[in-house]
């Protein structure tokens, strides 16, 4: 059984977590063996969405119904996600990379370091310019931070320059990117980070 690298994807409901996974997997699946675990509270909606996109065979995607606080399932009691990892590897023992998508949660959500090797936290511009200024452990502690849906900035009166400045205050030199995943704008920076900072470090 392989020992895959695991990347956690966290962020509020509707920020673009599932779409991010779809776009990234579509690019990387030609180069390596990938699996995905999604977390929803009472459904397996995100699993269905990814299956319907066809980015991966159905046996490489597992949906977890957390049945409660999504934060607990990725940190305090991640047993359901550990079980899902085992099931994925039983189905496909060649998997090299697993994405674990959390259920939509607040700015404080972080992944257990025992569950994932790296984490990405994503918000969207529509939540307001002030979000990066509020900080939050999800944004501060993540290895990579994404501000998605940049196309909405004019409609909600958000300054991307101000959001960038506020992000740098909390994250310092740690990487982040602006994206519009609908058009793939900014996606390349995310891919480059995964290929160079995650895969190269994780495989050494």
Swiss-Prot record:
Positions contributing to GTP binding: 11-18
One GO cellular component term noted in the UniProt record for this chain: cytoplasm
Keywords assigned: Chaperone, Cytoplasm, GTP-binding, Nickel insertion, Nucleotide-binding
Main localization, broad class: cytoplasm
Taxonomy, superkingdom: Bacteria
Entry's localization field: Cytoplasm
Record bears the keyword Plastid: no
Stated name of the protein: Urease accessory protein UreG
Organism: Staphylococcus epidermidis (strain ATCC 35984 / DSM 28319 / BCRC 17069 / CCUG 31568 / BM 3577 / RP62A)
């Amino acid at each position: 059984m392989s020992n895959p690298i695991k990347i956690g994807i966290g962020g509020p409901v509707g920020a673009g977590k599932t779409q991010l996974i779809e776009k990234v997997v579509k690019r990387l699946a030609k180069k390596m063996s990938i699996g995905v675990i999604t977390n929803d509270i009472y459904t397996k909606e995100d699993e269905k969405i990814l299956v319907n996109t066809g980015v991966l065979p159905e046996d490489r995607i597992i949906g977890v119904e957390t049945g409660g606080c999504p934060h607990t399932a990725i940190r305090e009691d991640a047993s359901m996600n550990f079980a899902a990892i085992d099931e994925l590897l039983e189905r496909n023992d060649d998997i090299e990379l697993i994405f674990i998508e959390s259920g939509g949660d607040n700015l404080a959500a972080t992944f257990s370091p025992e569950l994932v090797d790296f984490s990405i936290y994503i918000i969207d511009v529509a939540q307001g310019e002030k979000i990066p200024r509020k900080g939050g452990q999800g944004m501060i502690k993540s290895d990579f931070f994404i501000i998605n849906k940049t196309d909405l900035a004019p409609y909600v009166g958000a300054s991307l320059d101000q959001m960038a400045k506020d992000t740098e205050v909390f994250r310092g030199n740690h990487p982040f990117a602006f994206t519009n995943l609908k058009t793939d704008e900014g996606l390349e920076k995310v891919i480059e980070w995964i290929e160079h900072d995650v895969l190269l470090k994780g495989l050494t």
